[in-house]
Amino acid sequence: MPSDFFLQPLDGGPRVPVGPGQTVIGRGPLLGITDKRVSRRHAILEVVDSQLRIKPIHRNPCFYQSSEKSQHSPMETQVWSQLHPGDSFSLLLDKYAFRVFSAESEVEMECTLRNSQMLDEDDILSEMQKSPVVNLPDKTTGASQLQGSPEITKTKCPTIDPMSSSGECRAFSEHQPRPTQRKRILPAWMLAESLSDQSLSTPAEGGDKDVIQRSGKAGTCEDRTPGNTSWHGKKRLSPSGNSKSVSAEQDPGKKCRKADQEGPGVSSENVPESSSSNIVKDPDVDIVKTNKQKDGILIEELGEVSKHKAATKPTTNEEGESCARVQSKSPPEKSQGCHPESSSAPSSPDALHTDTADPVLGCSEESKVRRTACMYGANCYRRNPLHFQHFSHPGDSDYGEVHGTDEGVIGDRPECPYGASCYRKNPQHKMEYRHSALPARVALDEDDDDVGQPSDDEDEEDYEPTDEDSDWHPGKDDEEQEDVDELLKEAKSSLHLKH
């Protein structure tokens, strides 16, 4: 039989149905209360004639609150009190409050909710029917404005100057697609550089001599064709009106470093005077600069290879001859590194330092300190480059020369106590100790009876016998010998008696 009443906890939780008849409520699983202040038999609920009533049976009172009042009032014990739908009661003053619901009240509440929802929907529909009449002009005007805005953007944005940056133009330009081609605007420092290039290119009208002198000061290469070098500088003068441009056609491996360092000087001659006010021709300057950077990288790599070859060439005679050979086989700039006073415009200090240091390294290879031999030899498993710099291994030119003989080792070392007869095979031991042959001992005379006595070259005063220090007594040895003989005789006699 379905229950007519339900208890809804105000603190949250599932509803508790109240069956017909009496129901004891309190601490337990029915209401989910575990507080010790609530008794297991705290009150009794009873359903009589479709009405619910409560009777407190514990000394701690229960509290009642009607749907019309906002305060809890204590109920008398052992007295029945009616509970109507919507009323609430609590087992304690501040906790465990429950509200009473009935099935009929639930149906009535659902009906009222449906009615209220229907009324709300009717109100909304009536408002919606009235609102289009009032709001249609606004919507139509808004739509017309939205439709007209693309036309405004199309008509207004192209007419606005691109240099003027205003907030309205930016807002309209966001809707407009970006053009495929855009005019390039160079920064101020590039414009200043182009003007300086033009000012440098104007004195080129004086003649070919001025151009050649200026290119020499700027660091361009002159025509040099030595027998053993592969450096070729080609110059070509192209007369064009009032000005003459000098263009150096050089391969990536045949371009001098000075021309790369003095980039503005060369670019000033390549830029004609007609490009004084045009900004469109400025990308050519960028192309020239990128080509120069690529050529400079290749030149530096080739320069390092040539320096390495020049530094590693063997020197057969004196240091002066080897330096002269390095100068003759190196490019012209390398010879300028050996003799800086001969060059009119030296290059950067770093390049000059490296050029002057490489021949010195090549000349000083003869006086290189030999490395010590590794104690592990061919069985060495180390791969550290520093280890190979300090120690030599089998296959190296200086391996085996350090510890092969004791005479070739430089430095003072202690003498091995075993000398030449040392049986140790550790090369580290041979490097740390000398193994020279011990001097032959002086042969003693066969007729010499003074064995164990001090030699003649020592002082006789140190070995003079004295009565005080001597422990020798003449009579003691004879007495000891007699005692030994007596003991032997006694032993023999005892043996004969036993047999």
From Swiss-Prot:
Q: How is it modified after translation?
A: Poly-ADP-ribosylated. In addition to binding non covalently poly-ADP-ribose via its PBZ-type zinc fingers, the protein is also covalently poly-ADP-ribosylated by PARP1.
EC number per UniProt = 3.1.-.-
Zinc finger boundaries on the chain: PBZ-type = 372-393, 414-435
For this UniProt entry, the molecular function terms from Gene Ontology, in alphabetical order, are: 3'-5' exonuclease activity; ADP-D-ribose modification-dependent protein binding; DNA endonuclease activity; DNA-(apurinic or apyrimidinic site) endonuclease activity; histone binding; histone chaperone activity; nucleotide binding; poly-ADP-D-ribose binding
- Give the InterPro entries listed for this entry: APLF, APLF_PBZ, FHA_2, SMAD_FHA_dom_sf
Region (Flexible linker), start-end ranges: 401-411
The Gene Ontology CC terms held by the record are: cytosol; nucleoplasm; nucleus; site of DNA damage; site of double-strand break
Biased-composition ranges, Polar residues, are 141-152, 239-248
Give the sites modified to Phosphoserine: 116, 149
| Residue intervals of the FHA-like domain | 1-108
Membrane spanning residue stretches: none
Could you tell me the keywords of this UniProt record? Answer: ADP-ribosylation, Chromosome, Coiled coil, Cytoplasm, DNA damage, DNA repair, Hydrolase, Metal-binding, Nucleotide-binding, Nucleus, Phosphoprotein, Repeat, Zinc, Zinc-finger
As given in the record, the signal peptide range reads none
Which parts of the sequence are annotated with region: Disordered?
134-183, 197-292, 305-358, 440-499
- Record-annotated residues binding a glycoprotein? 371, 376, 381-382, 418, 423-424
Q: What segments bear the compositional bias annotation Acidic residues?
A: 445-470
Annotated localization: Nucleus; Chromosome; Cytoplasm, Cytosol
What this chain does, per the entry, is described as: Histone chaperone involved in single-strand and double-strand DNA break repair. Recruited to sites of DNA damage through interaction with branched poly-ADP-ribose chains, a polymeric post-translational modification synthesized transiently at sites of chromosomal damage to accelerate DNA strand break repair reactions. Following recruitment to DNA damage sites, acts as a histone chaperone that mediates histone eviction during DNA repair and promotes recruitment of histone variant MACROH2A1.
Q: How does it assemble?
A: Interacts with LIG4. Interacts with PARP1. Interacts with XRCC4. Interacts (via KBM motif) with XRCC5 and XRCC6; promoting recruitment to DNA damage sites. Interacts with XRCC1. Interacts (via C-terminal disordered region) with histones; interacts with histone H2A, H2B and H3-H4.
Provide the family line. Belongs to the APLF family.
Q: What is this protein called?
A: Aprataxin and PNK-like factor
Source organism per UniProt: Mus musculus
Q: Which gene encodes it?
A: Aplf
